[in-house]
Amino acid sequence: MDAGASYMRLTGEENWVEVTMDEEKERKGKDVQQGKYRPQVSKPIINRDTNTSFAYKGIFLWGIQITMWILLWTNMCVRAEDYITLISDPYGFSPIKNVSGVPVTCVTKEFARWGCQPLGAYPDPEIEYRNVSQEIVKEVYQENWPWNTYHWPLWQMENVRYWLKENIAENKKRKNSTKKGIEELLAGTIRGRFCVPYPFALLKCTKWCWYPAEIDQETGRARKIKINCTEARAVSCTEEMPLASIHRAYWDEKDRESMAFMNIRACDSNLRCQKRPGGCVEGYPIPVGANIIPENMKYLRGQKSQYGGIKDKNGELKLPLTVRVWVKLANVSTWVNGTPPYWQNRINGSKGINGTLWGQLSGMHHLGFNLSQTGKWCNYTGKIKIGQETFSYHYKPNWNCTGNWTQHPVWQVMRDLDMVEHMTGECVQRPQRHNITVDRNQTITGNCSVTNWDGCNCSRSGNYLYNSTTGGLLVIICRNNNTITGIMGTNTNWTTMWRIYRNCSGCENATLDRKETGTLGGVANKNCSLPHKNESNKWTCAPRQREGKTDSLYIAGGKKFWTREKAQYSCENNIGELDGMLHQQILLQKYQVIKVRAYTYGVIEMPENYAKTRIINRRKRELSHTRKKRGVGLVIMLVIMAIVAAAGASLGVANAIQQSYTKAAVQTLANATAAQQDALEATYAMVQHVAKGVRILEARVARVEAITDRIMLYQELDCWHYHQYCVTSTRADVAKYINWTRFKDNCTWQQWERELQGYDGNLTMLLRESARQTQLAEEQVRRIPDVWESLKEVFDWSGWFSWLKYIPIIVVGLVGCILIRAVICVCQPLVQIYRTLSTPTYQRVTVIMEKRADVAGENQDFGDGLEESDDSKTDQKVTVQKAWSRAWELWQNSPWKEPWKRSLLKLLILPLTMGIWINGRLGEHLKNKKERVDCETWGKGD
């Protein structure tokens, strides 16, 4: 029975005893109880340098790892999460608003000829892409896919324009020949892709639709038509398209799919335009405020726009667009003879058809030819159009201009002046002011507004002035006696309008009642029509008259409700009229330039649930501390592989660039050699001609000398040119002495000099061209870079590779760290085994008693605290043999039974023996310093 139980039995009081047991991991000298127990074996071991060295070793290893991580982090600067790009991360990429600063290059065949990169320099966008979820696209672009004026097509057009101006003299000389290769470029048959380098990429929209935004409550027009992209993917290059082209009406069949994708449909199926016969407008809406040619390239704008409906309010390209323009692939399947099916409704060949003003009715400019709309004739013009300029150029490509081009894809440009595409896809002929009358016969029933055309009905064709329920005025256009084709509105109320009307000259008693004049009706007096402001900003009700002609006054909504409007039709359409620059500009609108955090090639599909992936990655990071050894090796291996991969990729790109420069230089050198050969041939021909003249001169001099010697009539000697040989005025028998027949085929001196001058001019030109080609070849050869110069030029690392000279040191350091780590990993278990064998493990038992227990034998004399210590009774000296026996016994009783571990333990017997012997020797000087423990005398309980 323990002391606590005896105390309870005797006193009846509880004696609470707290017993705590914990493993003694950190041994300190002050925690060791002195008394009966001799200083333990572990105490001198703890006081030695063994444990501190291992602590320093751990700190040193951690320092090495932290240093390596810092070095790797500063050099790589990429986290593991950054390798997963554009995947369920709205901040994985950022849109680039100013695309003019984005570097771009073209990729095509014969790249050195056209200043592009080889086809393998960038991955194929059909293979290399990354899908981007709809949520990310919506969050980044807010359902508004913006318009961008890309500078790449403008650069291409500028290059062609510059080349045409530089070779204008040569072009005038060529009459019946073409320059091979250039015609292919001008015709758009040289195709390629536009690519952007890392860290930039292209976000390609693969599914989109349009919807109206910012509806004007006064006019009902949509200030903006926004594009909502619902599916997108990231690529490096665009689709294949012509690198350049002059003005053309029809495009190749290869472009049909890309052009058809630009026919964007409306998102909302409940829009009013969906219920109309023609449906809603399809196409790409170039927004209001777009700059087709930016300010920094204003020299390309020209005077008048050559792009049909793509123009500003002055018919030029100097100002931003003030009216929305739609560009779409024309639906030629329903056309008749190359024209829309309703063109037969034209009146006397008018350009206005069904509310649309059409341009280019007779013919279209196509690759230097004038083609008819029906495809029945084509005329060679001798001129080509590039941008806003026209050049005289002999251009006859190898295609049949008389073929049936009407089935080829063609762009249709529509300029919607009213901008009410969400209400109707039909165009209307605007009414004149004298055709606008007040409805007195209840022709209009219901309540409608500029935003609600279906709220009222009409029963008779006409143009009716209607008092809106919102307080403004409406002009309701009714056609076919029951169809409302348009509503124009203004915030000016009915009372204000009548006050202005009464102030017009001669209109004090006039009205706007309808008179039966024509199908649409009109007012009785045209000089008292709906009022408007003239050019002097004064109110008037009469149209302007000049030379017996009355000016036409049309009406539009909003601010133009009270001004003089000249446009008769609400839409302007044209087909063709675009060149390669604008063709590329339209096709590039499906792309947005973005900047990514990390860019890798290959197909990366979107994961189904990125949150689960992040949780798994977080769990892996939480467990990563158990794999530190493996992690360090893996990081080192990844670093080495990354360096090798980066070097390989960089060398590959540099090699491609070097081949490009080399090929260009070789081609230029070949041209120089050919020019030198031409100069040599011309020189040889000139030498032959000079030699021939010298022979003729010698022969003539010889004959003259013979005549003078034989006749000696110097004063009568006279030579003149006659039938290309020389005769004299002397006697006729003189001619028998000279045989002139051999010189009849020779030219005169004047002809010989003229021909010699021609040879001289030709030779001078050839020598000049040869020198220019030689100089150009030398410059091209000097431009051939080596691998490292190519890397610096392409990537602009500007000394980033300066640290490569430290790679051997880094590699040796890494190998040394690996070896040191391996040695430590081998020695650490041995040291741990040694510590385990040499240091017994104790448990600390703490007994706390509230009262002294009544224990029998409390008055017993226990001595001075040293009597019961067996070790203190006999002072035995520790010898080497005893230490060896003790070490051998520890090895025999070790808990490790595996053969390989026991073999390793044999190596520890000798150091263990030395440790035991040294501890024994060190313990001898403590025998006279034994501490006496005074035991408290326990009194007996009463």
Swiss-Prot record:
Self-association state and partner proteins as the record states: The mature envelope protein (Env) consists of a trimer of SU-TM heterodimers attached by noncovalent interactions or by a labile interchain disulfide bond.
Cleavage, annotated site positions: R630, G631
Residues of the signal peptide: 1-80
UniProt protein name: Envelope glycoprotein
Lineage, broadest ranks: Viruses, Riboviria, Pararnavirae, Artverviricota, Revtraviricetes
Coiled coil: 663-713, 754-789
GO biological process, one term: virion attachment to host cell
Sequence ranges on the Cytoplasmic membrane side: 821-942
Extracellular side of membrane: 81-799
Post-translational modification: Specific enzymatic cleavages in vivo yield mature proteins. Envelope glycoproteins are synthesized as an inactive precursor that is N-glycosylated and processed likely by host cell furin or by a furin-like protease in the Golgi to yield the mature SU and TM proteins. The cleavage site between SU and TM requires the minimal sequence [KR]-X-[KR]-R.
Organism whose genome encodes this protein: Caprine arthritis encephalitis virus (strain 63)
